[in-house]
Amino acid sequence: ASIMSGFTYATLTTAIQDYTEVDSNVLTSTITNQFIENAELRILRDAPIDAYKKQKIGNFVTGQDTINVPAKTLFVKGVQVYDSTSASTGNNRWLEKKDESYLQEYVPSTETAARGQPKYYAMFGGATGVSDTDSGRLFVAPAPDTTYTFKIHYETIPDGLSSSNTTTYISQYFGN
């Protein structure tokens, strides 16, 4: 059995033009780049690759029920919260993912009496994946009553195939 050698940016754009039987005057690089980006994101979503699994450790701010997800996050796989405020070892719990409306109904306030160790999380805020301030946010409930250590397990968005990044893991191993 032979292994496909994969694509470079140049060979893939040529293959797209050959398949559609049009040249670069009709099928511009802007259009083919969007095809490529959409395909890469679909592959990453449907066939998670171990090399792109990451973890981020941090601490909650007492009374603050939202945190930024890490830069270039494609999706969050899970969130652990530790009993400790200084270590990501020992007793911990996995937060249960819920809809934002569930969390708002579960604990409608961040007042001191409503705080505790978070049990639930929800995603919100839309995401472009470029930086930690625009990669979406996590909403937790209840709001933390101390600076618990957390660990976010997530799938990252690798640099995509482009004229300046001519090969990627996906272009080499997901050729057809």
PLM feature segments, named:
Residues 4-176:
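Glycine-enriched, solvent-exposed interface loops adjoining structured elements
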